[in-house]
């Protein structure tokens, strides 16, 4: 597959040919189910005539059906473009196909999509990760040059790691959330999934920047990262030793090999433990579900989306939500409503926010002394379909990614090895807030060392 860097140098006629070839390949590879159109048999959604970029099904694109992988949004047509889409169009890139996802981005396997499963292109018996599983599978499967996803607790980094591509979550507030269907407003962040680190940096440069339409967008100085990539730069890297040691044997072996390569190249490696990670999962799911219960209250069958049969207004609300939401979404709405309810708000939500502040302080303390943090993306490689049916087990699988969202830091997953089942293993790098340049420099160095 042509890289994004190469595609941006093509003439308009060459881009036209590329789009035709890519569309033919998407139709041929229908079994992968990376795109909603592959699962439904509908024509491929397109906007613009530029370099084709696959778009997760929770990002608004004017005139497209955008459903967030949910039955409740059947029939909804987006009336406007997300800011990220406007930025693509302004740089001669185009929205090209809706990628499958876990319903409302709530999941780690892309098994909860209303449209059906997406397969992992490396091994079809295994999940592609989630919630941006369609975006990662499309890029890794050679049916997308690059893609946009969203990351609330690892939903860009983890599927990219499971499928063997690069997943980049920018600092919270760096990329506008205007036009992103909200799951958890204080955690969600749009970002790129790409074939390599440089392509991820290029796509990030295009979509990043302050946006007055988004109240959570930070007005922080921004300059191009891709133009200044330096994979030769020597960095101080802190390895989270207990996270590496607690990973599966194959993952641990691959991570230690990557650490040795970084050390031999000249990066300074130090080791530390994050001992208080036992609070991460609880804090994340309390905060995320609390925000989700509020954000998803707008889906009532009245204003947009699917409307159920009903005799009165109350019945309309109840029937539309009961029939429209999947089991995982219902579970998280109920949990979020519970933790915000009278008598439990202080016991759960306020404590979770205090834990969040503690988690952020832990990262800041480490990053005061190191340029980057190195740790796993996931404790294991991609599991088989059905193995994550236990909600608690599924929630615990995010243990190495969710704390980064709680802290609002930039992070990236970089492929480093394959296991005996041809499944990918990735390392995760984390940087200080707003220091995407150092993050990309470190990721490029790691990528170069792995590729030899």
Swiss-Prot record:
Q: What is its EC number?
A: 6.3.5.7
Q: Which reaction does it catalyse?
A: L-glutamyl-tRNA(Gln) + L-glutamine + ATP + H2O = L-glutaminyl-tRNA(Gln) + L-glutamate + ADP + phosphate + H(+)
Instruction: Fetch the Pfam families from UniProt.
Output: Amidase (PF01425)
Q: Which PROSITE patterns match?
A: AMIDASES
Mind telling me which SUPFAM superfamilies this protein's record contains? Answer: Amidase signature (AS) enzymes
Question: Which GO terms are recorded in the biological process aspect for this UniProt protein?
Answer: translation
One GO molecular function term of this record is: glutaminyl-tRNA synthase (glutamine-hydrolyzing) activity
InterPro entries reported in the protein's UniProt record? Amidase (IPR000120), Amidase_CS (IPR020556), Amidase_dom (IPR023631), AS_sf (IPR036928), GatA (IPR004412)
Using the UniProt record, name the top-level EC class of this enzyme in a single word: ligase
Q: Which keywords, in A-to-Z order, does the entry hold?
A: ATP-binding, Ligase, Nucleotide-binding, Protein biosynthesis
Entry-linked HAMAP family: GatA
Cross-referenced NCBIfam families, in alphabetical order? Answer: gatA
> Can you tell me which family this protein belongs to?
Belongs to the amidase family. GatA subfamily.
Q: Name the PANTHER family on file.
A: GLUTAMYL-TRNA(GLN) AMIDOTRANSFERASE SUBUNIT A, TRANSAMIDASE
**Mind telling me what this protein is named?**
Glutamyl-tRNA(Gln) amidotransferase subunit A
Q: Name the species this protein comes from.
A: Campylobacter curvus (strain 525.92)
